């Protein structure tokens, strides 16, 4: 029996999905139907055919539904027919025109190419003819100019000949007139050699006679003959002789200068200045000539030759300076003195002062001169390198750096500055030590003399290094000054503070009549009253206070010095001195200097803490302890009496005022304010201790609140620091002691506290509540805090 489920056996193709027609033919062939004999198979085929019929009917219905749309589109297409025929005709006509234009353009462009080729050949022919004529003209012109000794004109003809295209001349030699051209070339070459010899000879004569107009005349001819390097070399040689002659003349004047002369102390710096100004004047005068006749980029060559001569003359001047000023011997002497345990006789710092000033002036003049050269050469290179590659520009920059950084002038100045730094260190250290040793105090002044003297010396040394225009030198001196202030000078002040603020006999007298009588009785037994001890103690107290002022002024002076250096060096960097690396080095040195200011502030704080501990605390504690002797378990009558005759706080305020008056007169406002802040902190801490040892009733708590308010009001007037924060705990204790009943604390605690931040812990609150004798301990314990 046939397999009806197999499409291959029924039709040989897969069955399509429902709704998709298979065309006008059934998938089941007639032969298949005829071959079927089984009823079930026939019924299956019948059902299949019925299904296909339904699909075909649906497709026909769908097509019939589209009939109107299709017919309307067909009508539209019929209407478009004539237009499409017109478009077809226009397109064919346009294609014909494009083809014609293309052919025409091709013909025209080929003719243009032919014309362009002919034009180029014509130009070449004209150029060749012009070159031949130029060659003849140059030959005739150079002969005439040489006969008339018109060397400029002769050089112009030779220059024109040298600029001719050699390939064109070579082609001309191969033509019919080759022999004539060869003859002309030979004559021109002979004239060229002859003119070179004449110009060289005439230039030598002019330089020998010192005839500057003639020297410049023939100097301008060299580049026309292609002798750029030779011209610059010979002209530089002439200029170097002028520089050497003037420098030797100036050096002779130096050696003959009387030491009483106004400029005798800086005569060598003046000599270098004259040398540098002379070379700068030469560069300014002849730069236009070099740029005009030799072209941009050639000034470097001229300056390179001049710098060699400058180095020779600088070496002579510096040698004379070292010898006459005994510079190296002074350095060795200083070096020996700087060594620890040195037994050699110390050199007087004043002897070094003029030498150090002259060295920095010499270096400053050198730096200014080198900056001038760098600026001139750089601007000349920029013009010449406008179209050059980056590699060429970098190579020129390397040449410039090498010339200025490695010249003998730079090396010599670096050596002098190296010795200068050591000598300046010695000058600063010895002068600072002398200022400390000669320290004096004038009555009415807050500081002693050494602070102003020391910072005058430090500023002078750093300022002198700054005047050298060398960032390395300046940074070295800032570092040395930082070390001197941080170590040596700070140690002096630290030692004075560590001696402490003495507890004097007069203080003992103030503490009570009993101790005063005892001291006087002891003194009378010895037959005298020891006023010297009192005087020396007063001096020690004054010394301590003055030292505190000195420390504070030192910190401020260092900060001011840092700001001044920042301002001054901004000007230096804006002038092109140094670079990013130098700027970073300078900033690092200033950071170290600023750190020293912080160390002086730390030392000041240590001194204030010492003063507070030794001079204020021993006095304040007994005054506060008298609070315990005043009862705060009082009745209405006592409360009223306390209001009329205050038992404690007014006397305490008076004692504080009297004690702090001594310090107010002897300390700067800033230090006094800081000391007052420490004193208020001490009062707050000590008063809290005695309050916790006292007992109160309701009126006693109210009395304590009044006393505390009076104390806070007074302390607020004597300092700019915040007082209320320091007395916050005491104020909260006063609030607690003022409560009418224990549970009233809950109105101020927790969620009910509002903006109030409690400084007391729950345990401390209970402790303060327990100070009220009228509060039961059971009620306090029951509180939930």
Curated annotation (Swiss-Prot):
Coiled coil: none
Region ranges (E domain): 741-785
Keyword Phosphoprotein: yes
Location of region: Disordered: 1-25
Region of interest: Interaction with STX5: 85-153
Chain segments carrying region Interaction with SCFD1: 2-84
Swiss-Prot/TrEMBL GO biological process terms: Golgi organization; protein transport; retrograde vesicle-mediated transport, Golgi to endoplasmic reticulum
Main localization (coarse): cytoplasm
Domain of life: Eukaryota
The protein's assembly and partners: Monomer. Component of the conserved oligomeric Golgi (COG) complex which is composed of eight different subunits and is required for normal Golgi morphology and localization. Mediates interaction of SCFD1 with the COG complex. Interacts with STX5.
Full protein name: Conserved oligomeric Golgi complex subunit 4
Species of provenance: Bos taurus (Bovine)
Gene that encodes it: COG4
């Amino acid at each position: 029996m046939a397999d009806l489920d197999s499409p291959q056996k029924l039709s040989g193709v897969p069955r399509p999905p429902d709704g998709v027609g298979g065309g006008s033919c059934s998938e089941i062939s007639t032969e298949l139907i005829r071959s079927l004999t089984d009823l079930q198979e026939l019924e299956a085929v019948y059902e299949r055919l019925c299904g296909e019929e339904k699909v075909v009917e649906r497709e026909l219905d769908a097509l019939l539904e589209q009939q109107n749309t299709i017919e309307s589109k067909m009508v539209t297409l019929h209407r478009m027919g004539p237009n499409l025929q017109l478009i077809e005709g226009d397109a064919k006509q346009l294609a014909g025109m494009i083809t014609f234009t293309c052919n025409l353009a091709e013909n025209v462009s080929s003719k243009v190419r032919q014309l362009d080729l002919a034009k180029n050949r014509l130009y070449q022919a004209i150029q060749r003819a012009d070159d031949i004529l130029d060659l003849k003209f140059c030959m005739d012109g150079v002969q005439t100019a040489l006969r008339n000794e018109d060397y400029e004109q002769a050089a112009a003809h030779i220059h024109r000949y040298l600029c001719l295209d050699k390939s064109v001349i070579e082609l001309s030699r191969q033509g019919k007139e080759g022999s004539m051209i060869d003859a002309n070339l030979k004559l021109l070459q002979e004239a060229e050699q002859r003119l070179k010899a004449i110009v060289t000879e005439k230039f030598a004569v002019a330089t020998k006679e010192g005839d500057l107009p003639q020297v410049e005349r023939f100097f301008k001819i060299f580049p026309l003959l292609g002798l750029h390097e030779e011209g610059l070399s010979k002209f530089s040689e002439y200029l170097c002789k002028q520089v050497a002659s003037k420098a030797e003349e100036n050096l002779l004047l130096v050696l003959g200068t009387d030491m009483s002369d106004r400029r005798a102390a800086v005569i060598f710096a003046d000599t270098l200045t004259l040398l540098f100004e002379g070379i700068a004047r030469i560069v300014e005068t002849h730069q236009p000539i070099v740029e005009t006749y030799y072209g941009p980029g050639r000034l470097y060559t001229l300056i390179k030759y001049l710098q060699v001569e400058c180095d020779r003359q600088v070496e002579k001047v510096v040698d004379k300076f070292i010898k006459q000023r005994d510079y190296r011997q002074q350095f060795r002497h200083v070096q020996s003195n700087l060594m620890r345990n040195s037994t050699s006789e110390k050199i007087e710092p004043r002897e070094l002062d003029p030498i150090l000033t002259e060295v920095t002036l010499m270096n400053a003049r050198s730096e200014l001169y080198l900056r001038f050269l760098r600026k001139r050469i750089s601007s000349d290179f920029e013009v010449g390198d406008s179209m050059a590659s980056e590699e060429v520009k970098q190579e020129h920059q390397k040449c410039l750096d090498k010339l200025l950084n490695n010249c003998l002038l730079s090396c010599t100045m670096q050596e002098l500055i190296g010795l200068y730094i050591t000598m300046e260190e010695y000058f600063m250290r010895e002068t600072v030590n002398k200022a400390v040793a000669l320290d004096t105090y004038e009555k009415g002044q807050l500081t002693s003399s050494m602070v102003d003297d020391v910072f005058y010396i430090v500023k002078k040394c750093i300022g002198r290094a700054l005047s050298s225009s060398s960032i390395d030198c300046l940074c070295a001196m800032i570092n040395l000054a930082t070390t001197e202030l941080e170590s040596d000078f700070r140690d002096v002040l630290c030692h004075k503070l560590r001696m402490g603020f003495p507890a004097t006999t007069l203080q003992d007298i103030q503490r009570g009549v009993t101790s005063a009588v005892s001291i006087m009785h002891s003194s009378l037994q010895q037959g005298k009253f020891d006023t010297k001890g009192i005087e020396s103690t007063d001096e020690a107290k004054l010394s301590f206070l003055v030292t505190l002022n000195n420390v504070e002024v030192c910190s401020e002076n260092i900060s001011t010095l840092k700001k001044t250096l920042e301002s001054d060096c901004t000007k230096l960097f804006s002038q092109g001195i140094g670079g990013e690396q130098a700027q970073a080095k300078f900033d690092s040195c200033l950071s170290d200097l600023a750190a020293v200011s912080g160390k002086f502030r730390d030392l000041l704080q240590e001194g204030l803490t010492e003063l507070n501990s030794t001079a204020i605390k021993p006095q304040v504690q007994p005054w506060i302890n008298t609070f315990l002797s005043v009862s705060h378990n009082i009745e209405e009558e006592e409360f009223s009496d306390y209001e009329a005759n205050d038992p404690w706080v007014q006397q305490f305020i008076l004692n504080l005022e009297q004690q702090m008056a001594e310090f107010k007169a002897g300390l700067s406002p800033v230090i006094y304010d800081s000391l007052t802040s420490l004193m208020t902190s001490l009062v707050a801490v000590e008063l809290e201790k005695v309050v916790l040892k006292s007992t109160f009733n309701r009126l006693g708590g109210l009395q304590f609140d009044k006393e505390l308010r009076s104390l806070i009001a007074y302390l607020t007037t004597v300092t700019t620091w915040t007082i209320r924060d320091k007395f916050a705990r005491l104020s909260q204790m006063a609030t607690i002691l003022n409560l009418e009943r224990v549970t009233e604390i809950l109105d101020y605690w927790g969620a009910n506290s509002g903006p109030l931040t409690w400084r007391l812990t729950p345990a401390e609150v209970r402790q303060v509540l327990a100070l009220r004798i009228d509060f039961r301990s059971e009620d306090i314990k029951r509180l939930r805090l």
